[in-house]
Amino acid sequence: MKISTFNAKTKKKKFVNAEEINAFKVAYGKPLNRKDYLRYAIIPGLVTGVFSFLLLYIWWLSLIFGLMGSVYGLKVLMPKVIKRAYERDSFRERNKFVNNMTSLLANDSQTLLTSLQRASDRSQGELRADLKILLASVMGADQEQVLQAFKQMSNKYRDDITFDQYLEQLETCVLEGRTNLETLKDIKTHHNEMKEKKDDYERKKEGHLKDMKMLCGVIVVFVLAITFSFGFKTYITAFARHPIGWITSGIYMTLMCFFFKSFTTYLFDDSIMEVKA
């Protein structure tokens, strides 16, 4: 399945299937395997199951929460993580291509098509395949065919505005038979700046993710401290087996779910050029 098809489908429905997730995974990596499924099922399942058990010590309720956590991990977290990794790798490959292509064009002995051939050879994954198709489409093509070939490439990567501008300049170079190197260098500089911003943004999010993991550990320690400070039997009878404990735990779990949902929304929002309404 093509990535463009995947993107169109994911905008229309909440969950995606394994084939669609795999389309992202194989674009710049290996296909989904058993370890991927186990990882995204076991970790969220254990976190929700163990945490609910520490609050109420009801095994069957913890089992239900554990199953819910596993489903959430497979249906929500796994697609988001894989899609985010795809977008990161795709952008880095585009940035590498822009830098390689500009460097090659700076050499007067290199023609545009020769530079495109060499730059595509240095690329990897999905972008490499797209560049090979573009190169094959423009070689010996008339003006209309060149326009159509670049239009298809541009439509696929239109979310990367700077890269789209770079493609427009390459299209002009092919049609006019001359290279506007200074303009290409300016676009390359801007794309490099975007990469630096994205990398810095990702580092900040990784730091917040570490803080989130630490917070979860602190919460577990806090719950255990309360449990053993009152005595295990007292905690069970006065809280875990009491309606007050059920209501309090229900409210607490609900608040934690909302907090986690807000955090994951922030974590997987990598757009730094758009302002949300």
Curated annotation (Swiss-Prot):
Tell me where the transmembrane regions lie.
37-59, 63-82, 214-236, 246-268
User: Where primarily located?
Assistant: membrane
Give the source's domain of life in one word. Answer: Bacteria
What UniProt keywords are attached to this protein's entry? Cell membrane, Membrane, Plasmid, Transmembrane, Transmembrane helix
The way this protein sits in the membrane is described as: Multi-pass membrane protein
Kindly list the places in or outside the cell where this protein is found, as annotated in its UniProt entry. Answer: Cell membrane
Record keyword Transmembrane helix present: yes
Would you tell me the Gene Ontology cellular component terms?
A: plasma membrane
This protein is called Uncharacterized protein pXO2-23/BXB0022/GBAA_pXO2_0022
- The scientific name of the source species is Bacillus anthracis
